[in-house]
Design a protein with these regions (language model features):
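Non-cysteine beta-strand/loop elements that form the S-adenosyl-L-methionine
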Residues: 123-134, 153-156
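Sequence contexts marking disulfide-bonded cysteines in secreted/extracellular proteins
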Residues: 2-4, 162, 175-177, 198-200, ...
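Glycine-enriched alpha-helix->loop->beta-strand junction motifs that scaffold or abut catalytic
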Residues: 120-125, 147-149
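C-terminal accessory region of radical SAM enzymes
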Residues: 160-165, 169-175, 217-220
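Conserved alpha-helical substructure of the radical SAM core
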Residues: 1-114
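Accessory C-terminal segments flanking Radical SAM cores
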Residues: 180-220
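Basic phosphate/pyrophosphate-binding loop/patch that engages nucleotide-derived ligands
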Residues: 138-157, 174
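Short, charged/polar "capping" segments at the starts of alpha-helices
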Residues: 108-111, 134-139
Length: 220
């Protein structure tokens, strides 16, 4: 990560790993052509809760609980019927890490009260990606108001340092509106090391079914 402030530099120096994605489902309830996780091509599949818990526990032991941020991802993570249990386990093994659920937001209005109570008690952030024709900043802001939640937009690394205990926080990110163009080289002749070092997401790792990937793409 590029640190723009002294506070950010100190924050990241305290952590062994800047960012880890944990995949809760392979599939999604959208069919985006630009999906970098290839969810539209995936079969309906959820990573078993026991596997996720084992992975999170092992990561906590190896990283000595020094992970700056964890993103609970998919596919669409809210499709996983054990999402509440996964949230509790994530917070159990990473009590001080910034944890967020990355969702397209479609299922949020139908989520049970138990889900929202867990969000509040664990301090896990609900981060909604923006999609044309699916949601908007104003819609998300109004939804956050209905839930009595804090609303954030265009969050920075500084927000990772915040603790969100006993309140609901809803954020937005650019989603498909903010993604860069990722060309596929079918010939396989590109310089892998160069591409990895210059990828804007090169610090974004992925934990999935017993494997720790240095790149989120290859986990899919």
């Amino acid at each position: 990560k590029t640190c723009k402030t002294v506070e950010q530099k100190i924050f990241f120096e305290k952590h062994l790993i800047p960012d880890v994605n944990i995949l809760l489902s392979d599939h999604c309830n959208l069919n985006c052509a630009s999906c970098t996780n290839y969810a539209p091509l995936a079969n309906k599949k959820f990573t078993p809760f026991e596997v996720i818990e084992k992975d999170i526990k092992k990561l906590s032991e190896l990283a000595q609980n020094k992970v700056a941020r964890i993103d609970l991802m998919g596919g669409e993570p809210l499709l996983n019927p054990e999402i509440v249990e996964i949230m509790w386990v994530s917070r159990k093994y990473f009590p001080s890490t910034n944890i967020a659920i990355e969702t397209n937001g479609i299922l949020l209005k139908s989520m049970p009260e138990e889900f929202w109570q867990t969000v509040k008690e664990t301090g896990i952030i609900v981060r909604i990606s923006l999609y044309n024709g699916i949601n908007s900043v104003d819609e998300i802001k109004n939804f956050a108001k209905e839930k009595g939640a804090d609303f954030r937009q265009n969050c920075t690394v500084d927000d990772w340092c915040c603790q969100n205990e006993h309140k609901i926080v809803i954020e937005t990110n650019g989603g498909c509106l903010d993604w860069k163009y990722y060309p596929l080289d079918l010939s396989g002749k590109q310089d892998l090391n160069y591409n990895f070092e210059n990828c804007e997401q090169h610090c974004c790792c992925c934990l999935h079914e017993g494997f720790f990937y240095p790149c989120t793409r290859i986990a899919n």
